[in-house]
């Protein structure tokens, strides 16, 4: 049954192919051509009978030839299978070639990727080396920065130590000079006392025995300035360095009056003080510029001051003087507070003394200056006073007038600064740069307590001379400077 069905299927297939192509169609391949020739030659022949298989003859209508066609069912099936196998082989070959090409492409990619991977590994290695080198350089830079900071700190410490040593040396030199002055004053005092004793002895010999010797005025200066009595007063009220240094210098001016003990009209004698200030001494008849004993109101503090009675209109109390550079003004806070120097030469009266003087009334300030060519100028301020030490002696100034230019108002309202007390508005200590004590701002338009340089123009790392910026500038050290105060009843602020 199955062979018969297969035979029908193949015959139908051949009939369809033959109807589609026709007898005039081109024959492709040798096997198809021989098959068609066999059909045409034997179309009227019967196939040989075989004892195993049965054959059938179908008559398929043709366009030109009519009749039955006998087809061998074996041979077309074999040819078709061969064609199918060839197509499959070709497909397999093509697939193999395609896969071979893909494999070659993959091998090339693998080779390229392998090179890239090796390059990436090399770059990573170089990157690690570079990072390590950068880290080393960074650490070296940090060590260098730290070393420089340490060196800068050590240098700053050395500079501070040098400054302190210099200040100590200058203080020792100043103390040595003060001791020399003390010795000279003591020698002068001993000589003067010897002369006074001799004069008294001579006077006693001239006075008759029956006539009582007239008594000297009760407030005579020798009684005030004798060392025992004066030392007791000073020990009670003050230990001012200036007072202890200069207490022996007031006696010589009074020596000429000592022989006149026989003059009886005591009502004409001048009061010997102490006075409230130099103006009161002038009003009491003391018109000579000299050292006077002053006791401000509201305090028991006695102080010796230089009174300038010649500068019009007189009555000026000198609080600072610079004239020859004999005194070092680069001092600490306590020294500036108590005062230092020589009252008849370069000296600073003392912040505490200035405070008590200026707070007993309205005072004005006069600053006289002279350069090295002899030119003299002045600056006057209508009011001048200091706050107490709790306010670090803050400066209070009034209105300016004069011909020197205003270089002090910029310091108004500022606290006093020394090398060991920094109260200025600058980030550092202005006293270290200006080499003095002053009411520094940031830092100074005037520096009258600076270094006294000879000749005017000076060379220094900082502007540390005795200068008034509006008069000759900050790089010019003035020859003479005097700061003095006087009561001003018509004070206006």
UniProtKB/Swiss-Prot annotation:
Any one GO CC term of this protein is: extracellular space
- Gene (name only): Angptl2
What PROSITE patterns does the database record attribute to this sequence?
FIBRINOGEN_C_1 (PS00514), FIBRINOGEN_C_2 (PS51406)
The Gene Ontology biological process terms listed for this entry are: blood coagulation
Q: What does this protein do?
A: Induces sprouting in endothelial cells through an autocrine and paracrine action.
Q: Where, subcellularly, is it found?
A: Secreted
Disulfide connectivity?
Answer: 278-307, 430-443
The protein's matches in SMART domains, at most eight in alphabetical order, are given as: FBG
Checking SUPFAM superfamilies in the record gives:
Fibrinogen C-terminal domain-like
Q: Kindly indicate where the leader peptide sits in this chain.
A: 1-19
Q: What keywords does the record list, in alphabetical order?
A: Coiled coil, Disulfide bond, Glycoprotein, Secreted, Signal
Provide the primary localization. secreted
Protein's name according to its UniProt entry = Angiopoietin-related protein 2
| Entry-linked PANTHER family | FIBRINOGEN ALPHA CHAIN
Tissue expression, as annotated, is: Widely expressed in heart, tongue, lung and skeletal muscle. Also found in lower levels in kidney, epididymis and testis.
Name the domain of life.
Eukaryota
Annotated Fibrinogen C-terminal domain ranges read 269-489
Q: Which residues form a coiled coil?
A: 77-115, 152-202
Q: Which organism is it from?
A: Mus musculus (Mouse)
Glycosylated residues, chain numbering: 164, 192
């Amino acid at each position: 049954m199955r062979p018969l069905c297969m035979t029908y299927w193949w015959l139908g297939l051949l009939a369809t192919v033959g109807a589609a192509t026709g007898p005039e169609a081109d024959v492709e391949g040798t096997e198809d051509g021989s098959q068609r020739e066999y059909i045409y030659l034997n179309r009227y022949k019967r196939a040989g009978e075989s004892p195993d298989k049965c054959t059938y003859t179908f008559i398929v209508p043709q366009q030109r030839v009519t009749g039955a066609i006998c087809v061998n069912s074996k041979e077309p099936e074999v040819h078709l299978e061969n064609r199918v196998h060839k197509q499959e082989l070709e497909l397999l070959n093509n697939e193999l070639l395609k896969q071979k090409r893909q494999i070659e492409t993959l091998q090339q990619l693998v080779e390229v990727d392998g090179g890239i991977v090796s390059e990436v590994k090399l770059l990573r290695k170089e990157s690690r080396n570079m990072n390590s080198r950068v880290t080393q350089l960074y650490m070296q830079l940090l060590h260098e920065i730290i070393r420089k900071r340490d060196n800068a700190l050590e240098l700053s410490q050395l500079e501070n130590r040098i400054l302190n040593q210099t200040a100590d040396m200058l203080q020792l030199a100043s103390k040595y000079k003060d001791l020399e002055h003390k010795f000279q004053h003591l020698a002068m005092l001993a000589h003067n006392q010897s002369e006074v004793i001799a004069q008294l002895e001579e006077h006693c010999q001239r006075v008759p025995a029956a006539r009582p010797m007239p008594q000297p005025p009760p407030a005579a200066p020798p009684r005030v300035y004798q060392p025992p009595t004066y030392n007791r007063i000073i020990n009670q009220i003050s230990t001012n360095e200036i007072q202890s240094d200069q207490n022996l210098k007031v006696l010589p001016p009074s020596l000429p009056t000592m022989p006149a003990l026989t003059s009886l009209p005591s009502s004409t004698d001048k009061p010997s003080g102490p006075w409230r200030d130099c103006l009161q001494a002038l009003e009491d008849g003391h018109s000579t510029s000299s050292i006077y004993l002053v006791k401000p109101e509201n305090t028991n503090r006695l102080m010796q001051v230089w009174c300038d009675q010649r500068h019009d209109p007189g009555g000026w109390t000198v609080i600072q003087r610079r004239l020859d550079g004999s005194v070092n003004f680069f001092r600490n806070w306590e020294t500036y507070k108590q005062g230092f120097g020589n009252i008849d030469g370069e000296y600073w009266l003392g912040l505490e003394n200035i405070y008590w003087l200026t707070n007993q009334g309205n005072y004005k300030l006069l600053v006289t200056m002279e350069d090295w060519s002899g030119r003299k100028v002045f600056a006057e301020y209508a009011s001048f006073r200091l706050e107490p030490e709790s306010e670090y002696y803050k400066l209070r100034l009034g209105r300016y007038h004069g011909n020197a230019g205003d270089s002090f108002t910029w310091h108004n309202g500022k606290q006093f600064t020394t090398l060991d007390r920094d109260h200025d508005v600058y980030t550092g200590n202005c006293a270290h740069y200006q080499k003095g004590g002053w009411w520094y701002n940031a830092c100074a338009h005037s520096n009258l307590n600076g270094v006294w340089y000879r000749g005017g123009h000076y060379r220094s790392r900082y502007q540390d001379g005795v200068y008034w910026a509006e008069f000759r500038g900050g790089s010019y050290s003035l020859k003479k400077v005097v700061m003095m105060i006087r009561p001003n009843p018509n004070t206006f602020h």
